[in-house]
Design a protein with these regions (language model features):
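Beta-strand/loop substructures that line and gate deep hydrophobic ligand-binding cavities in soluble
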Residues: 83-140, 145
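Amphipathic alpha-helical protein-protein interaction surfaces
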Residues: 12, 22-25, 75, 102, ...
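Hydrophobic ligand-binding cavity/cleft-lining segments
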Residues: 1-43, 144
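Glycine-rich portal/gate segments that line the openings of hydrophobic small-molecule binding cavities
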Residues: 37-88, 100-105, 139-152
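Exposed loop/turn and edge beta-strand positions of beta-sandwich/beta-sheet ligand-binding modules
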Residues: 3, 64, 91
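Generic structural detector for well-ordered beta-strands
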Residues: 6-10, 37, 54, 69, ...
Length: 152
């Protein structure tokens, strides 16, 4: 399962990337992840850096922590991370920034790591509904980022 959303922002890619890649800002923008913090002494974005996010699933619960690992970190073009479980990636989130007209097109995407578990989840537990929810929430996240970068 995968999906994406794109929003145009009238701001330079560097400004947007700096806001996105500082995961401590996540709670300002994400409908579900209300806080995040770097782990293992990391103080900022770097390939392989780990962080954890505090998630309130579907904005109502359950509430849990996820450990994530930065998988793409190229200022000002892309930032990505994998949500880890038992040392394995289960979900991948990615931001791609591309110059466009008076600003930057920002695309946020997710892709569940293919496995028996994700296949069962998709077909038996309404995973397609989660895809719709993720796309809606990515659009909301990007709109909130847009509001901040265009207000400055």
């Amino acid at each position: 399962m995968e999906g994406s959303a794109t929003v145009h922002m009238a701001a330079p890619a560097e400004k947007i990337w700096d806001l996105i890649a500082d995961i401590r800002n996540t709670g300002r923008f994400s409908p579900e992840t209300f806080e995040a913090e770097w782990l293992d002494g990391a103080t900022g974005p770097a390939l392989g850096a780990r962080f954890r996010g505090h998630v309130r699933r579907n904005e109502i619960g359950p509430v849990y922590w996820t450990v994530c690992k930065v998988t793409a970190c190229e200022r000002p073009r892309e930032f990505g991370f994998a949500v880890m479980a038992g040392g394995r990636s289960v979900n991948n989130w990615h931001y791609r920034l591309a110059p466009a007209g008076d600003g930057t097109d920002v695309t946020e995407s997710f892709r569940l790591t293919p496995s028996v578990l994700t296949t069962v989840y998709y077909w038996a537990f309404g995973g397609w509904l989660r895809k719709r929810r993720n796309i809606r929430d990515m659009t909301k996240t990007l709109q909130r980022i847009k509001d901040v970068v265009e207000a400055d």
